[in-house]
């Protein structure tokens, strides 16, 4: 069966899915971009949950992910994934980004979540080239979904049409659109 992957232009904090992914920083304490938006929309409970995780485990290393409550968000949970900072591509950034996506998918599956929404991890202040990051995201997610029953559906939530078109083109090229 073909993986169920959709591209959406919009605000990830309003997605009515089981779990959303936060492009977090290692401190898990919120920040700019999507990280700050998710923390603001979720309310103080999310920061408290992140503080607890940090006290138990320390910082979250690049490529890793942790799961928390969602606070005031419509989602049931938030998976905080730390992607790599782009350093030119010679420091295992691609592998680290792939690991971040895989660890999110594994956490969602382990918790029985059927629907998952991803932002474009590492493409903001971390500077990962958007096209290369989209390719890693689409390939990693589609490969995982063909081998595992959960999650059943994944959304790539893009903040603008330009980014969404990158993902949509990749889905078409790989025959992953519903009509392909």
Curated annotation (Swiss-Prot):
One of its GO terms (molecular function) is purine nucleoside binding. Keywords: Hydrolase. Gene3D superfamilies: Leucine Aminopeptidase, subunit E, domain 1. It comes from the Bacteria. Residues 1-175 form the Macro domain. It holds the Pfam family Macro. It catalyses: 3''-O-acetyl-ADP-D-ribose + H2O = ADP-D-ribose + acetate + H(+); 2''-O-acetyl-ADP-D-ribose + H2O = ADP-D-ribose + acetate + H(+). Transmembrane segments: none annotated. GO terms for biological process: purine nucleoside metabolic process. Its EC number is 3.1.1.106. The active site is at residue 35. SUPFAM superfamilies: Macro domain-like. Substrate binds at residues 11-12, 25, 33-35, 122-126. Belongs to the MacroD-type family. YmdB subfamily. Homodimer. Interacts with RNase III. Deacetylates O-acetyl-ADP ribose to yield ADP-ribose and free acetate. Down-regulates ribonuclease 3 (RNase III) activity. Acts by interacting directly with the region of the ribonuclease that is required for dimerization/activation. This is O-acetyl-ADP-ribose deacetylase. The gene is ymdB.
């Amino acid at each position: 069966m073909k993986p169920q992957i959709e591209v959406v232009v919009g605000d990830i904090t309003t997605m009515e899915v089981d779990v959303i992914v936060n492009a977090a920083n290692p401190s898990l304490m919120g920040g700019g971009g999507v990280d700050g938006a998710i923390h603001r929309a979720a309310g103080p409970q999310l920061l408290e949950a992140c503080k607890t995780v940090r006290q138990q485990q320390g910082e979250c290393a690049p490529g890793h992910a942790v799961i928390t409550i969602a606070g005031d968000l419509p989602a049931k949970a938030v998976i905080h994934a730390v992607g790599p900072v782009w350093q030119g591509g010679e420091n295992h950034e691609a592998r680290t980004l792939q690991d971040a996506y895989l660890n999110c998918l594994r956490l969602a599956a382990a918790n029985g979540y059927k629907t998952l929404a991803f932002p474009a991890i590492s493409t903001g202040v971390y500077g990962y080239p958007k096209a290369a990051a989209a390719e890693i995201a689409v390939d990693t997610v589609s490969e995982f979904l063909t081998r595992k029953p959960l999650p059943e559906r994944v959304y790539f939530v893009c903040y603008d049409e330009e980014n969404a078109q990158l993902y949509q083109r990749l889905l078409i090229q790989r025959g992953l659109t519903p009509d392909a």
